[in-house]
Amino acid sequence: MSKVLAMILAGGAGTRLEPLTRERAKPAVPFGGRYRIIDFVLSNFANSGVYRMKVLTQYKSDSLNNHLSRAWRMTAFLGHYVEAVPAQMRTGLDWYKGSADAIYQNLNIITDEEPDYIFVFGADHVYRMDTRQMLDFHCTKKAACTVAAIPVPIEQGREFGIIDVGPDGRMRQFLEKPKDPPPMPGNPKMCLASMGNYLFSTDVLVQEVVRDAANEASAHDFGKSIISELYKRAPVYVYDFAQNEVPGQEAKERGYWRDVGNIDVYYQSNMDLVEVDPTFNLYNDRWPIHTQPNNYPPAKFVFADEQNHRVGHAMDTLVAEGCIISGGSVRRSVLSPKVRVNSYSEVEDSLLFENVTIGRRCRIRRAIIDKNVEIPPGMTIGFDPVEDRRRFHVTPGGVVVIPKGMKVT
């Protein structure tokens, strides 16, 4: 069997997710109540049988490193591991200059591991994928590099790096946010957008990052600097993610992929989960999303005084372990562990991170409340845009964001 290594890029600053990334790396941002964003790519590899994973970290990585050490302990004596690799300045006094430079600065890992193939994936996307199918495609095509791509409506192609492919799937051109995107073969209404996930034959990857490092004018980015040149001189193929089949996945879920690059997209991706029949279903035990186990008690709902409107209940909501809904109402929301909603309060269309407390008689709507925040009794959030902007961060889509540990008065 071929030796495969996954190198996961988790060193980006994640500035577009501020203030959620003010104290943590983007891949460590909570998602879906009990997960971190990075859990999705790691689960995809583990479920695919790829058990050697190096996570390249850099900015504000403490929370991410803690999560990896607690949630991703694998069977070391079988050679299985998930290891965080902090930026070490092995090639000079510079941090990572880009995604390609992150690999270049860690070529020692490749030398030590001696893999035949290397996955280079991002750590900040939400999706399910059987990566072995991409490897099979790569080997069948005898590709130097394979790029995962997702079909998007052609009118949205201006927002992505778009790939022009031939009928055999070989890349003919890579275009960054083109005004006139080329359609994908056989479907003039769709085009192929790069997912930022790559698979290389090892010798090709090493050769290309060394070549890129010698170019002082390079952006040292895989899409802009490596792929945009490699396809001109080597067989680069495009793997259509929409063809990927995951056990237990319904047809409507195939091709679900979200780049949660800004808060409005991140918010909506969480809201996707609370639908009665969600497009992305967390409840697929044939392809589970793994994360840190905890010893919190079950969620609890207390008080049923309907006459005085003091009924603890939640509808169309994900409620994690350790939560207590104490006479409050929660609708269309996602609650992380140890959240408490007190009597007579109403929470709607919101994300409450771990250890958030909502005092009595509060009204919360379309808000993201980060970890360790206490909302005092009687507070109203999400109903007065002017007042919300005066006190908090409000996104272009109108979502109110309260940072981790903020003292709300």
From Swiss-Prot:
Binding site for alpha-D-glucose 1-phosphate: 96, 161, 176-177, 194
Keywords: ATP-binding, Carbohydrate metabolism, Glycogen biosynthesis, Glycogen metabolism, Nucleotide-binding, Nucleotidyltransferase, Transferase
CDD domains recorded: ADP_Glucose_PP (cd02508), LbH_G1P_AT_C (cd04651)
Domain of life of the native organism: Bacteria
A Pfam family matched in the record: NTP_transferase
Molecular functions (GO terms): ATP binding; glucose-1-phosphate adenylyltransferase activity
SUPFAM superfamilies for the chain: Nucleotide-diphospho-sugar transferases, Trimeric LpxA-like enzymes
GO biological process: glycogen biosynthetic process
Pathway note: Glycan biosynthesis; glycogen biosynthesis
UniProt-listed Enzyme Commission number(s): 2.7.7.27
Catalytic activity from the UniProt record: alpha-D-glucose 1-phosphate + ATP + H(+) = ADP-alpha-D-glucose + diphosphate
Coiled coil (residue ranges): none
Protein family (similarity comment): Belongs to the bacterial/plant glucose-1-phosphate adenylyltransferase family.
Classification via HAMAP family: GlgC
PANTHER family in alphabetical order: GLUCOSE-1-PHOSPHATE ADENYLYLTRANSFERASE, GLUCOSE-1-PHOSPHATE ADENYLYLTRANSFERASE-RELATED
Function: Involved in the biosynthesis of ADP-glucose, a building block required for the elongation reactions to produce glycogen. Catalyzes the reaction between ATP and alpha-D-glucose 1-phosphate (G1P) to produce pyrophosphate and ADP-Glc.
Subunit structure: Homotetramer.
NCBIfam families, per the entry: glgC (TIGR02091), PRK00725.1 (NF001947), PRK00844.1 (NF002023)
Name of this chain's protein: Glucose-1-phosphate adenylyltransferase
Highest classification ranks of the organism: Bacteria, Pseudomonadati, Myxococcota, Myxococcia, Myxococcales
